[in-house]
Amino acid sequence: MAHLILIRHGQSLWNAANKFTGWVDVPLSERGRAEATIASCKLRDYRVNVCFTSMLMRAIETAVITLTECDDICGGKIPIIKHEADDENWHGWDNYDGDPAAELPIYPTATLDERYYGDLQGLDKAETTAKYGKEQVQIWRRSYSVRPPGGESLEDTRKRVYPYFTNRILGHIKQGDNVLVAAHGNSLRSIIMILETLSEEEVPKVELATGVPIVYELDKAAHMLSKAVLTN
């Protein structure tokens, strides 16, 4: 038995400003950092062994705060950002002669990045709705296969998330590790679609609050045994 903990990043500055963010690398707001701190307290009874995040700072910030505000989560280990050997952004600079057993690895990967919103990125959501109409914007935001102009659909996001999740992340689950994934609304919807076998009609309706952990209990075959949403 293992636990998979999913957490959407805390509120970002552009969440607060009601802008489409996508791949724009915006940091957490003060509220977002507080949400991650609260999440850490909620997870104090879970011992995390490994963490995966997107490459975007709002997800990495959320992961680091969640893992460091409550020492019980790490079991005395030090969270260290690591890179896969085949990561094109890795230059070997984080190599050192240390004890891996004293580390809690955090693996950033672009496969967990938010859905790319294309031409909508940086636009105010209310102004975009006024320009294109509520129905059209809702289709761009919450349909499964329709892409916003120049961007990705949820289906596109799932296609890039699926191989990494099933091979890399579930590999740790099958070893009995407790895994934290700090990512984004649509990359997490893609994971939830797999875990809960949701249909293409069901998954766009999944709502994820910022900074709220979702804890799945999984067996060694990665089948879901239980789910808990750790709200206030």
Curated annotation (Swiss-Prot):
Q: Name one GO biological process term.
A: gluconeogenesis
Q: Which SMART domains match?
A: PGAM
Q: Name the site position(s) for Transition state stabilizer.
A: H184
What EC number(s) does this enzyme carry?
A: 5.4.2.11
Record: residues binding substrate: 8-15, 21-22, 58, 114-117, 125, 141-142, 185-186
- EC category name: isomerase
Q: Which SUPFAM superfamilies match?
A: Phosphoglycerate mutase-like
InterPro entries cross-referenced by the UniProt entry: His_Pase_superF_clade-1 (IPR013078), His_PPase_superfam (IPR029033), PG/BPGM_mutase_AS (IPR001345), Phosphogly_mut1 (IPR005952)
Part of which pathway? Carbohydrate degradation; glycolysis; pyruvate from D-glyceraldehyde 3-phosphate: step 3/5
Reactions catalysed according to its record: (2R)-2-phosphoglycerate = (2R)-3-phosphoglycerate
Pfam family of the protein (one): His_Phos_1
Mention one GO molecular function.
phosphoglycerate mutase activity
NCBIfam families reported in the protein's UniProt record: pgm_1, PRK01112.1
Q: Which family does it belong to?
A: Belongs to the phosphoglycerate mutase family. BPG-dependent PGAM subfamily.
Role, per record: Catalyzes the interconversion of 2-phosphoglycerate and 3-phosphoglycerate.
Question: What's the protein called, per UniProt?
Answer: 2,3-bisphosphoglycerate-dependent phosphoglycerate mutase 1
Q: Which organism is it from?
A: Gloeobacter violaceus (strain ATCC 29082 / PCC 7421)
Q: Which gene encodes it?
A: gpmA1
